[in-house]
């Protein structure tokens, strides 16, 4: 009833309502990127254990020739969905910078897997891990972060936390090839 009365008043007085639009552009606050922790991804498989950053889940090996995965693990080898390993746009680089300090994904420097090796180099001390001969353990190198350009062209930063089942704090005696890692996806501008 009130709406009818207001409409009648507006029509009878020939008043056009004004709509206010602010003159300055309002930019929404940037949402801080989420950090996801994946525990005990079993990489004791052949050929690989495939993983998607977008879904936060492993991907069936039958999807290896698709863009549904970004990164794959087999023992200490890490492959990306690009180059010789898959049809995606993925690439990687290892930075000697702590995970928390990386706020922006580099625009270049990403390598793809090739016949001569993976984008993320293997071998003790040359990438994400070192082999400690005194305790016969594979240990992540503190302060190393892997930057990934995903299969779809976005960016993720990744830190390997443990290579052993259950992420033991002491000298590992548990099963190996069980990756625990944390990652964060960037926004569309490559910011974390």
Can you say where each PLM-predicted feature lies in the sequence?
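Sec-dependent signal peptide recognition
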Residues: 1-7
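N-terminal "domain-start" segment
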Residues: 11-144, 166-169, 183-192
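Short conserved beta-strand and strand-loop elements enriched in small hydrophobics
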Residues: 144-150
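Glycine-centered tight beta-turn/hairpin loop motif at sheet-sheet or coil-to-beta transitions
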Residues: 151-155
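Short, well-ordered, aromatic-rich surface patches in folded extracellular/luminal domains
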Residues: 163-178
């Amino acid at each position: 009833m009130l709406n009818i009365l207001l409409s009648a008043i507006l029509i009878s007085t020939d008043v056009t309502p004004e709509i206010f639009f602010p003159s300055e552009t309002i930019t929404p606050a940037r949402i801080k990127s989420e950090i996801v922790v994946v525990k005990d991804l079993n990489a004791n498989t052949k050929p690989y254990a495939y993983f998607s950053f977008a879904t936060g889940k492993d991907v069936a090996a039958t999807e290896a020739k698709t863009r549904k995965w970004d990164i794959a693990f087999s023992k200490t080898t890490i492959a990306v969905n690009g180059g010789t390993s898959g049809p995606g746009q993925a690439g990687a680089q290892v930075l000697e910078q702590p995970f928390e300090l990386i706020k922006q994904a580099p625009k270049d420097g990403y390598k793809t897997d090739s016949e001569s090796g993976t984008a993320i180099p293997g071998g003790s001390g040359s990438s994400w891990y070192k082999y400690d001969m005194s305790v016969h353990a594979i240990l992540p190198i503190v302060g190393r972060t892997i930057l990934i350009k995903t299969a779809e062209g976005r960016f993720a930063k990744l830190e390997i936390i443990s290579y052993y089942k259950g992420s033991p704090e002491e000298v590992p005696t548990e099963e190996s090839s069980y990756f625990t890692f944390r990652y964060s996806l960037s926004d569309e501008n490559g910011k974390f």
